[in-house]
Structure formats: C-alpha cells, structure tokens
A protein has these predicted regions:
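Conserved pre-motif I regulatory segment
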Residues: 1-18
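Walker A/P-loop NTP-binding motif
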Residues: 6-10, 26-40, 60-64
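Signature of the SF2 helicase/ATPase Hel1-core->accessory helical subdomain module
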Residues: 35, 52-55, 59, 63, ...
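A substrate-engagement module of RecA-like helicase motors
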Residues: 41-43, 48-191, 303-310
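A contiguous, basic/glycine-rich beta-loop/short-helix subdomain that forms a polymer-engagement track
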Residues: 155-191, 206-208, 308-438, 446, ...
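Conserved RecA-like P-loop NTPase helicase motor core
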Residues: 425, 437-446, 497-601
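Conserved interdomain hinge at the start of the Helicase C-terminal
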Residues: 437-471
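Conserved helicase motor "Helicase C" RecA-like lobe of SF1/SF2 P-loop NTPases
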Residues: 471-495
Length: 636
C-alpha cells in the first residue's frame, strides 16, 4: 500500500485503496505523505470520518510516522489539527463580548466535527456545565472542545463558542489569542493537516478556504465521504426557524422584523397544505410564492442588520458588535437557504425537495433540500489538480471499485485513477461463518415472528456475545424485548442510554447482547469473544420513500443506467460490508454473521451483495451454525 500511495502522490493521480482492519493503513499513507511534504514542500491534508480515528491518527500514528521519516530524511514533519470554527472556545464570548444565545444555531452548515463524542454532560445543569467550561478555559492550550473530558451538551458549548461567520475577525480585541485563528495559522504552516469529512463537505459546498492550500489529499474512511458532503449541502426551513431568526435580529440588532414574521406565517400556511414526502413536480405555486415573499423580507432585514453593524462599530469600541454579529449571521444564513430554495435547482434536478413533519412535539412542517449527486462537487472541489488517496476497508463493492469510484467523483476528475485491494491479515473463511437461513420468509414491513425466533435461537446457542444490527428502531426494540422475555441474557438496547456507554458495557460483558440500528453498523470495535455473533435482520436497502435515494435512482435511470443497482444495491452492499466487518477485528476472533434475509441467496442481486462482504465461509445449515456457536460459547 505504501508503494501505491507513493506512486499516486508522485504522479498526481487518484488512488482507491481497500485495506482491511489490521493492515496498518494509517502508517501506509502517512509515511509517503510526510516524505513528500518534507522533500517537495507540498502539504498533505488527511481527513477522517470519525473522532476515534482522528484521535488515533493525531496522537498515535502521526508521531510514529514522523519518527520514521525523521530517521530517514533528517527532517521531522510537522502535523496540525484543523476543525470547524465552532469546535473551539471563543475567548471574546467567554469574556462577555457576545450575549448569551438562548436558541440553537439554525442555518449554519453542520459543524465540522465527527458526531461521536465521549460525554454529553447530561448529568449536570446547563449552568454547571458552563461553569466547568470556564474553569477548563483557564488552562486549555488548544480551546478544542474534544479536549474537554467529560464533554458538555451542545447547548452549553454554544454559550462559549461562535461560528466562523459570527466571529468579529481582526476587529475582535482578543484576535491574537483566538483559538480557531491559531489553529488555522498552525495548519497553514504544517506539513500534514489532520481534519475531518465535515470540513471537506464545507469545501465541496463552495467554501474551499476552510482548508489550507494543499497538493495531496488523503481520505480515510472514504466510504463515508459522499454522505458527509451531501449532509453539508442539505438545508431545511420552517416557520419556527423564521420566527427564531426574526427574534434574534430584533433582539440583537434592534431592527424591525414585521415583514419577516409575516412571511414566516405565510410559509407555514403553504407547507401545511402539502402532504409529507417528496415534491416530484418541483415547488407548488403557493409554496414558491411564500418563499419569494420570504426572500424579499430576508434581504430587507439583512440590509437593516448590516446598517446596525456599521453603527455598532468595532468590538473594541462597542459591546454591541458581538450581538449584531449573531443577528447578521442568522439572517444571512437564512437568506442563503431561501435563495437556494427559490432558484431553479429543484426544477433542474440538481436538488431534491421534500416536506416533512417532525415526529415529536408540535413543530410545524419543514421544507428540506438536498443535492442529488455530489460526485461533481467532490471531483471539482476536492480532487482536481492534486494527488488523492481514498482508503477504507470497504471500497470494492461486488468485487469492483467502479461503484465507489463513480460515487466519489473519480470517474469525473481530470486525473487517472486506479483501485487496489491490499488484502487483509485475517483468514475470514477459517475465522467466521456467513449464515443465511433461507427457510425464513422474505422480510415484510416489520420483523417477522420467525425472524425473532431465529434471533433467540442464535443468541441462546451463543450464550450472548451478540451484536444485533436492525433496519429500524422498532425492529431493534422488538428484538430486545423478545430476548429479555425468552432468555436470561443481559440485553443492551440503543436508545436506553448513550451509545458509548452501551458499547462500553457490552464490551465488558462476554455474555451480553447489544442491539440497535444504523449507529451500530459502523465504527463499533469490540474484538474478542464479546462479539462472536453478528445478526443482521434484513438487507439494508434505503427506505422506498427516501427522497434522496428516489431522486438519485431516477437520475441514473434517465442517463441510461440501472438505478436500483447503482443506488439501492450499492447502499445495501456498503452497509452489509460494514456490518459484517464488526465480527473479525483481530487474528484470533471467531464467530458467525447471520443475515436473516433469504434474498441474499435467492435474489439476482444477492451475489453482488455477498461479494461485497468479508469472504466468510457460507452456509444455510442451521444445525451447523448452532453447533459452532455452542462450541464458541464453551470456549472451544
């Protein structure tokens, strides 16, 4: 892998590398990237999807790689960490330069940080959490939220941070001590910058300045990149959001917001007349008219807020500057969202739009827009004019790199690309069994009684040690209930506690079961006997009513391709590979992956899905599987 990465960097080409767990892929891309940086003076950006891998790269792997490069070249490469602006403490806000924010950030792009976070501070009140942050602020050298352990809630952190747009910049009296400014200065001088996929998503959405200049891009956990980029490009709007922005502008900038409030009410009326679901024919006339009125109102309020900002003057001269900056950012962000919604992006099939009503509470309906295809923006903003290495344990779907290459924009980029599978240190056929019980019925709307009985039989044979991956929360809850009712096993269920707490408890008990949904399919690393059985209730196709998948499939079909295989089957293959990959995490792991969906064996697309999974020994024989699980449970 190191040779392949070195060649891609030297030739400024693009490389997909499938490297299984245990191959040491972090060192395999860090060393050649660092050598190139110190010899050619060209910076590399390394991006991860999860906080866990980001920490591993920064704290463990990068120092090891730097040691090796220094011994070889005589020069030690420098490494810097870069995150989104709001992930850093704002000294000026802490000192009272901004008013307390009593509402959530509404329209800024999703914060550029992996979502997994250790500790949310839920045991403490908001005030207690803020006090703890203030005490930590006196000693921190980085201001990085993730250095605060245990962590605090998003609401508490919002009291001590700002977005990049809300920052007062050089007008701030504490600009020279600003944590995000210092982080960006360090990144601009470093040989290697470690960041995350959310930052890449912001760059792909039209803000390349969030990243320092770089000639080499390395994307680890690359199978998640397209979804992260799409997430950054997804925006929502509701009457409640409009009302909150209006209140922010009135409170912090003192401007008149009557027209904006009325436009928000008109939006609510227009959305209330529409059913939930995708707007397949574009925006209905009444909704389009409501958005046009809202756009005009936003622009007027934005003009007024900007005038208020001029009157407030620089932060050093007025305590109002921070408050007005909050108002300006809220209105400007909403204006950008509304302008996108009133553009022709839906009619031109660049975006897909849908109406949805929150499941809980009395929130009004909201309108959401999401990009249909992100391959072009990835190719243009992230891959063009630089070497790129994209790696993951799951890139060759159905035995081919072509599906992921198309999804990630490599087929559109101006450079040559190749896919390389460097293999795995594991002997999957000896270490694990892939069990597909073809006697079960084809899955319907929910999980069947027969499938629940199979879950119980497998868990009892294994005497626990089961990770259950289910396609819906309801199915996971039913499985947890049945396991508790019919077995004496300890069962941990997603939603009953914080996910890190549940995973930690599961890892500590060899005979427990952990069941959940999508959050458990990727990133759960529990080696050893604790996870000797992975149960997947059905092939994880996208929901039939998912607007983005529908629109993507239609676009592929319209272009002459196979929409089902390109979108739905590829989505399912990726998740199956990730889910099955939870079983074997080290060379002495053994166990069973059970997919309770006969379509994996009987459907025409089943072979494509099976080839995407680790090459476990396949069987349909229930007795063989139950016997193997019994021996594993007995420690044989």
């Amino acid at each position: 892998m190191t040779r392949c990465v070195s060649r891609a960097i030297a030739t400024r080409s693009h490389l997909l590398v499938q490297a299984g767990t245990g191959t040491g892929k972090s060192l395999a891309y860090l060393v050649p990237a660092m050598v190139h940086a110190v010899e050619a003076g060209e910076r590399a950006v390394v991006s991860t999807a999860t906080l866990a891998l980001q920490r591993q790269v920064l704290i463990k792997d990068a120092p090891l790689a730097a040691d090796a490069v220094e011994r070889t070249t005589g020069v030690r490469p420098s490494v810097a960490l870069l995150k989104g602006w709001q992930n850093y403490l704002c000294r000026h806000r802490l000192a009272g330069g901004y008013p307390d924010d009593d509402s959530d950030t509404l329209f800024s792009a999703a914060e550029a940080t992996p979502r997994a976070r250790v500790g949310e501070g839920t045991e403490q009140s908001l005030g207690e959490q803020v006090v703890r942050v203030r005490e930590w602020a006196a000693d921190t050298e980085t201001g990085d939220r993730d250095d605060l352990v245990p962590g605090v809630s998003d609401r508490a952190w919002a009291q001590v941070s700002v977005t990049g747009a809300e920052c007062l910049g050089t007008s701030c009296p504490l600009h020279d001590e600003c944590f995000p400014v210092l982080a960006r200065a360090a990144a601009a001088e470093a040989d290697v910058v470690v960041t995350n996929h959310a930052m890449l998503g912001i760059a792909a959405a039209g803000n390349p300045g969030v990243l320092p200049e770089h000639e080499v891009l390395v994307v680890d956990e690359a199978h998640e990149l397209a979804d992260r980029v799409r997430s950054q490009g997804t925006v929502s709007l509701s009457a409640t959001a409009v009302a909150r922005v209006a209140a922010t502008a009135r409170r912090h900038a003192g401007v008149v917001v009557t027209d904006l409030e009325e436009a928000g009410q008109n939006l609510q009326l227009a959305l209330a007349e529409l059913p939930d679901g995708r707007l397949t024919e574009g925006l209905p006339p009444a909704l389009a008219d409501a958005l046009t009125l809202l756009e005009a109102a936003c622009r007027q309020v934005l003009t007024d807020v900007r005038e208020a900002a001029k009157a407030a003057g620089p932060a050093s001269a007025s305590g109002d500057a921070g408050a007005v900056a909050l108002a300006r950012t809220a209105v400007a962000d909403m204006t950008d969202v509304v302008e996108r919604m009133t553009s022709d992006s839906v009619a031109q099939r660049r975006d897909v739009a849908w109406v949805e009503r929150p499941r809980l509470g009395a929130e009004p309906p909201r309108l959401t827009l999401s990009p249909i295809d992100v391959a072009g923006s990835v190719a243009d903003a992230l891959l063009a004019d630089r070497a790129a290495v994209l790696t993951s344990a799951t890139l060759a779907l159905g035995g081919s790199f072509n599906p992921m290459a198309a999804t990630l924009g490599l087929t559109l980029a101006d450079a040559d690309w190749e896919g390389v599978d460097v293999g795995t240190p594991f002997d999957y056929a000896r270490q694990g069994i892939l069990y597909t019980p073809t006697h079960l019925p084809r899955p319907g709307m929910g999980i069947s009684e027969a499938a629940l009985e199979e879950v119980v039989a497998l868990a009892e044979a294994s005497r626990g040690g089961m990770l259950g991956l289910f396609s819906s929360r309801r199915a996971a809850e039913e499985a947890a209930g049945v396991l508790r009712e019919r077995t004496g096993l300890t069962v941990y269920a997603q939603g009953e506690d914080r996910l890190p707490t549940l995973v930690e408890a599961f890892a500590a008990d060899e005979d427990a079961c952990l069941v959940g949904t999508l959050s458990l399919w990727q990133g759960v690393d529990v080696p050893g006997r604790t996870c000797r059985l992975v149960v997947i209730d059905r092939i994880p196709f996208p929901r039939p009513d998912d607007p983005v998948s529908q629109a993507r499939s239609e676009a592929v079909t319209a272009a002459g391709g196979n929409g089902f295989m390109t979108v739905s089957a590829t989505h399912a293959a990726l998740l199956l590979a990730q889910g099955a990959g939870r079983l074997v995490r080290r060379a002495d792991d053994r166990g069973v992956v059970a997919v309770l969906d006969p379509r994996l064996r009987t459907a025409r697309y089943g072979a494509f899905l099976a080839r995407s999974m680790p090459p476990l020994w396949p069987t349909r024989d229930r007795d063989v599987v139950l016997g193997a699980l019994g021996r594993l449970a007995a420690g044989q």
